[in-house]
Amino acid sequence: GLFLPTAFTPNNDGKNDVWRVIGLEKYPNAIVSVFDRAGQLVFFSDQRSPRYWNGTYKGQLLPNGVYVYMIDLKDGSGQVPKGTVSIIY
């Protein structure tokens, strides 16, 4: 299964600086999307891009807050795990 951390702290202290879906390697075709409260896509990852999010959008750190993720596993199951992740400074 997947483990989806509920928060991370992208403050470059070497601890929890990125949000990474644990177990995603079992789903090589999965697509990960993260949206802000307004519904704007702020992170997208597929098999050709990094599989973790550092809390930035267009090179700028995003503010504290709750963001919504959606993971299309692309494994034929139709499962699309959804939830929230918080950025905390």
At which residue positions do the language-model features occur?
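Short loop/turn motifs at secondary-structure boundaries
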Residues: 1-89
